[in-house]
Amino acid sequence: MSLSAAPASDLVAGEGEDYYDKLGVTKIINAAGTYTILTASMMPAPVQAAVARAAKHPVRLMELQTKAGEYLAKRLRCEAAMVTAGAASALTLGTAACMTLANKSAPHDMPTDVTGSNNEVLVQKAHRYDYDHALRNCGIRFVEVETIADYEAAFNDRTVMAHFFNAAQQGQIGREDWIRVAHKHSVPCFNDAAADVPPISNLWNYTQMGFDLVAFSGGKGIRGPQNAGLLLGRKDLISRATANNSPFDDCVGRGMKVAKEQIVGMVAAVDWFLSQSDEAMQTEFQRRADRIAAHLKDVPTLQSRIVVPPVANQVPHLLIRYDQQRVKVSPLAVAAQLRRGTPSIELNPATGRNEGSAGLPSDVSTIVVGVWMLEPGEDMIVARRLREVLTSNT
């Protein structure tokens, strides 16, 4: 049958050719976490099936986006919702919504024409981070504050938004006070909670707390498509965010296209995630960490402990330390050997580094194993390889 005559249902039937193998791409075991550079999470089988089914039929994109948003808003207990091209896209589109609201302007006016416009976004100095480039795409100017008095005094006619980085461990102003002061000045509050599920209830905790907009990554804890995300919040702001997004032409979000497969996949992932239990997930992750630790218990001088970060990636991680005078290999060298091995294994990037990663404590003497993105049985593969590398250097 020729390609032009083959129905879509036939084209996607079966597993098909393995293009990773065809392209010579190395498959890995992900003992790191939901990092973008490692293709984030694995979609569960029901989500994969929903994506494949969505690929079989064309639809009207805005009808799909609208109905998906309405469905998600009901499930996630908020006024309105939309599927975005990841959390960074949600940050840009939410900021664009606040900019166009404050300036009573059209999407095509941003960000090329900000001269004389209202474009100030308040943020705690301790909440500045690499990802705030997604906000700066809209032509905003950050105004940094540290104390509640600074914050109160920073509002003026040019203030369009107050931004909060949910996972930040520093900063003097908590969520409730951040919201209260902004709302006193009739300014919307945006919370970047990209990596902050589980727990499942965080999907509605922050909007119910009073944040006007909240961004989540779709391809992390929710286990949706890697290039999908969620923007939740006030109906008027979600409407403006939608107007600033693809498929509309002259707007800041034109390059942030979300395909039908990603929209359906994100909805399916939310359905799947809401069917899970926080307790069951945490118990399974704890078991994986315990199994790895038990397999390493007789490595000389080795000590292990399990740490759960306080906000982002709030799941058990295994931290391993040992005397490098007895086990003569550094954590960074262990990570390199596991990466080069077969199968190739990636450890958490906090391994062997003085700075922690996403709330995980670490130093040059610590191996960090993320267990929550492991597939069944992979925990013991990681355990065996760690043991091989460590014991071969004693």
PLM feature segments, named:
Residues Q48, G69, A293:
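Generic structural marker for isolated residues within well-ordered, non-membrane alpha-helices
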Residues S4, L386-T394:
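C-terminal alpha-helix/helix-terminus motif
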Residues L61-T66, A80-A81, G253-K257, Q276-F285, ...:
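Flexible, glycine/charged-enriched surface loops at secondary-structure junctions
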Residues M1-D10:
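N-terminal export signals
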Residues K297-V389:
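Conserved C-terminal alpha-helix-loop-beta "cap" of PLP-dependent enzymes
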Residues A289-A294, L319:
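A glycine-rich beta-turn/hairpin centered on an aromatic-Pro dipeptide
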Residues I29-T66:
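A glycine-/small-polar-enriched, mobile loop at the entrance of the PLP active site in fold-type I
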Residues L11-L38, M42, G69-A81, A88-L274, ...:
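Conserved PLP-enzyme active-site core in the AAT-like
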